[in-house]
Regions:
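A general structural motif
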Residues: 20, 50-54, 83-87, 112
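Acidic, aromatic-enriched beta-alpha/helix-loop junctions
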Residues: 42-52, 56
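Short proline/glycine- and acidic-rich turn/helix-capping motifs at secondary-structure junctions
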Residues: 60, 120-122
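A glycine-rich helix N-cap at a beta->alpha junction
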Residues: 110-118
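STAS-typified acidic loop motif
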Residues: 2-39
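Cofactor-binding loop segments of dinucleotide-utilizing enzymes, especially the Rossmann-like FAD-
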Residues: 28, 93, 120
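Glycine-/proline-rich flexible loop or hinge segments
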Residues: 23-25, 54-59
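Amphipathic alpha-helical interaction surfaces in cytosolic regulatory modules
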Residues: 38-42, 57-107
Length: 122
C-alpha cells in the first residue's frame, strides 16, 4: 500500500493519507460530486491498517454531501480499527461555532475515537 495525496484547490481539500497512520484532510470542501471525490479516499482507507491512527481534520467549510462522506470515512476506520487507538484532532477557527458543533456531532457518531478540539486564531 502506498500513501495517497490529493492536492487541494479553492473548492477541494488537500488530502494526505500516509501508511504511517497520519491522515489529514484540510481546506475547503465543496466538490461538485462528493461521492466521486471520496472514492479513492474510501478505497484507500478500506484496505488500511496501522497500530495507531492519527487523523487531523482542518476544514474551513464543507457542504452536506461532504459531511456524509466524512462520516463514511470515519465509520470505515472505526470498523477496521480492531481495538487500535484512533486519535482525531478537529481544527476550527476561533468563533466558528458551526465547525466546532460539526466536530462534536462526529464525536457522538464515532465514540471509539479519541477526539480533541483545537481552536486557532483567524
Amino acid at each position: 500500500m502506498e500513501d495517497l495525496f490529493i492536492q487541494g484547490t479553492d473548492s477541494l481539500p488537500t488530502v494526505s493519507l500516509k501508511t504511517t497512520g497520519e491522515l489529514k484532510i484540510a481546506g475547503r470542501a465543496l466538490p461538485e460530486d462528493a461521492v466521486k471525490f471520496f472514492v479513492p479516499i474510501l478505497d484507500w482507507i478500506t484496505g488500511f491498517s496501522a497500530e495507531e491512527i492519527n487523523i487531523e481534520i482542518n476544514l474551513d467549510y464543507f457542504n452536506t454531501s461532504v459531511s456524509k462522506q466524512l462520516l463514511d470515512f470515519f465509520k470505515i476506520i472505526e470498523q477496521n480499527r480492531a481495538n487500535k487507538v484512533v486519535n482525531l484532532k478537529w481544527m476550527y477557527e476561533d468563533g466558528d461555532e458551526e465547525m466546532l458543533e460539526s466536530g462534536e456531532l462526529y464525536q457522538e457518531l464515532v465514540p471509539g475515537f479519541h477526539f480533541t478540539f483545537h481552536k486557532f486564531a483567524e
